[in-house]
């Protein structure tokens, strides 16, 4: 590659680097900066202080909220993987027609074209006291009265699963369609069963998609505040804690909690990416 071509490549990436810097790095840097400021009725006073972090790490509520959020998010990721992997596998290997694959993908994507609040609130007529599930259970004689299905950890996980499972399906599907079928054929030729070929060839090669999907779902659920506020029934999550502090104009405290959240994201991503190379997905 000539010097001119190298210079041309560098010039071409300048606009994208500026976008990342302005809309990504600078806001994060501002959040970190505000997290060291003093809170006031006007939002914050630009006076350096570590008191926000002292209060954050010295509070038992922080550990409780972080544990609850990570536990519920991990359960959601596991369920999304159990549900999403078979769907992605079926779409990649069982649906042969590209037209049918496109149709199925559109059917999965169309609900996400609706407003998030509408999709979330649609769970009320499903899980509510007079919702479809309770009416069905009562008419079937399973229960004598309506069950309290909303405002619980189970309902929160179910709504998260419905909302973010597509984020698990898509990267797994992209990883599966990139797998060379000759590897599976070679395993079968050497005497491996379909299940053994899947475990030894398909699953390891699809791990980048699993990792990317898991990170997507984990980040989305940990940072979500609207769903816990509407359906959590008093369950405190990290995203909800940040939103409540920000709405109360406790911006430095909210920023400190946000920095903690970012550090958790980075730590989890680092641990996972040490063992899986997601560049194979692209």
Predicted regions and their residues:
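Membrane-water interface segments at the C-terminal ends of transmembrane alpha-helices
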Residues: 5-41, 56, 60-177, 201-223, ...
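Short hydrophobic, aromatic-rich alpha-helical segments embedded in or entering the lipid bilayer
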Residues: 44-58, 233-245
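Membrane-helix/interface signature in polytopic inner-membrane proteins
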Residues: 173-185, 193-194
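Hydrophobic positions on the alpha-helical face of helix-turn-helix-like DNA-binding modules
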Residues: 186-187, 197, 242
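Glycine/proline-centered hinge or cleavage motifs at structural transition points of membrane proteins
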Residues: 190-192, 204
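Membrane-helix boundary and inter-helical linker elements of multi-pass secondary transporters
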Residues: 247-249
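Short cytosolic juxtamembrane segments of multi-pass membrane proteins
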Residues: 275-282
């Amino acid at each position: 590659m000539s010097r001119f071509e190298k210079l041309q490549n560098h010039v071409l990436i300048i606009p994208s680097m500026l976008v990342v810097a302005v809309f990504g790095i600078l806001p994060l840097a501002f959040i970190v900066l505000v997290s060291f400021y003093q809170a006031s009725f006007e939002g914050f006073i630009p006076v350096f202080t570590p008191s926000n972090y002292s209060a954050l790490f010295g509070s038992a509520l922080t550990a409780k909220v972080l544990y609850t959020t990570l536990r519920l998010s991990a359960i959601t990721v596991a369920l999304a993987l159990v549900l999403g992997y078979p769907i992605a596998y079926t779409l990649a290997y069982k649906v042969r027609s590209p037209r049918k694959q496109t149709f199925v993908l559109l059917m999965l994507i169309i609900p996400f074209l609706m407003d998030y609040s509408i999709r979330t609130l649609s769970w009320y007529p499903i899980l509510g006291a007079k919702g479809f599930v309770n009416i069905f259970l009562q008419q079937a004689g399973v229960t004598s009265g309506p069950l309290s299905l909303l405002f619980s950890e189970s309902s929160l996980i179910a709504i998260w699963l419905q909302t973010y499972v597509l984020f698990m399906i898509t990267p797994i599907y992209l990883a599966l369609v990139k797998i060379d079928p000759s590897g599976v054929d070679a395993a079968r030729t050497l005497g491996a069963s379909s299940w053994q070929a899947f475990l030894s060839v398909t699953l390891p090669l699809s791990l980048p998609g699993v990792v990317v999907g898991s990170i997507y779902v984990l980040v989305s659920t940990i940072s979500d505040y609207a769903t816990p506020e509407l359906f959590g029934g008093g369950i405190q999550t990290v995203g909800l804690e940040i939103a409540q502090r920000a709405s109360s104009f406790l911006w430095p405290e909210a920023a400190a909690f946000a920095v903690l959240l970012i550090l958790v994201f980075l730590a989890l991503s680092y641990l996972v990416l040490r063992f899986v190379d997601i560049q194979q997905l692209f």
